Amino acid sequence: MTLSFFDQFMSPTYLGIPLIAVALTLPWILFPTPSTRWLNNRLITLQGWFINRFTQQLLLPLNLGGHKWAVLLTSLMLFLITLNMLGLLPYTFTPTTQLSLNMGLAVPLWLATVIIGMRNQPTAALGHLLPEGTPVPLIPVLIIIETISLFIRPLALGVRLTANLTAGHLLIQLIATAAFVLMPIMPTVAILTSIVLFLLTLLEIAVAMIQAYVFVLLLSLYLQENV
């Protein structure tokens, strides 16, 4: 069987059973559980500080009606960061490189924000489809364009996360393969390539965290329009 660079994105199976469910559930074990002690350890304290700062930054532009989403959005943020970071380890599988998973997260959450807007303030929600002061001949065209842009939002959420992580993983694999092949032929070039690989890995770690933040931030912006 001919191997491909895209084989790393295939869902692994064991005895015919897809292991993507294990890849989605096991990362929760890595999160520390708070204890009943007055003083927690450094890891729990750092985790609490991060969640507190992120929640404040996320909910700052939202009114009180959107604050009930704090637990959901914060949990989603930590979940995506964990999956993205664990996928950078060797011989691991990154579930967030699958468009089906990302669309499964993006579509229901986006649809929930739209339903909330239609239920709480239907006039304002429908008003987003037609900007104020639009000339009468352009009204049908603008309504169609705004409707299309509304339905493209979940697709943009899922494709953005998938494309960024897939591109980073492919670059890492290409440069790592080049360094491995060049080592016996041109050791100096191979060492320089390995340095580039190390720097790219650091960049991919930042991308893994930033993309999770962008995913949740865009959801909060969609929520802001409808609460």
Curated annotation (Swiss-Prot):
It catalyses: H(+)(in) = H(+)(out). PROSITE patterns: ATPASE_A. SUPFAM superfamilies: F1F0 ATP synthase subunit A (SSF81336). GO terms for biological process: proton motive force-driven ATP synthesis; proton transmembrane transport. Disulfide bonds: none annotated. The keyword Ion transport applies. Keywords: ATP synthesis, CF(0), Hydrogen ion transport, Ion transport, Membrane, Mitochondrion, Mitochondrion inner membrane, Transmembrane, Transmembrane helix, Transport. The keyword ATP-binding does not apply. It is a multi-pass membrane protein. The chain crosses the membrane at residues 12-32, 69-89, 98-118, 132-152, 180-200, 202-222. It is found in: Mitochondrion inner membrane. One of its GO terms (cellular component) is mitochondrial inner membrane. One of its GO terms (molecular function) is proton-transporting ATP synthase activity, rotational mechanism. Belongs to the ATPase A chain family. Subunit a, of the mitochondrial membrane ATP synthase complex (F(1)F(0) ATP synthase or Complex V) that produces ATP from ADP in the presence of a proton gradient across the membrane which is generated by electron transport complexes of the respiratory chain. ATP synthase complex consist of a soluble F(1) head domain - the catalytic core - and a membrane F(1) domain - the membrane proton channel. These two domains are linked by a central stalk rotating inside the F(1) region and a stationary peripheral stalk. Component of the ATP synthase complex composed at least of ATP5F1A/subunit alpha, ATP5F1B/subunit beta, ATP5MC1/subunit c (homooctomer), MT-ATP6/subunit a, MT-ATP8/subunit 8, ATP5ME/subunit e, ATP5MF/subunit f, ATP5MG/subunit g, ATP5MK/subunit k, ATP5MJ/subunit j, ATP5F1C/subunit gamma, ATP5F1D/subunit delta, ATP5F1E/subunit epsilon, ATP5PF/subunit F6, ATP5PB/subunit b, ATP5PD/subunit d, ATP5PO/subunit OSCP. This is ATP synthase F(0) complex subunit a. It comes from Salmo salar. The lineage of its organism: Eukaryota, Metazoa, Chordata, Craniata, Vertebrata.
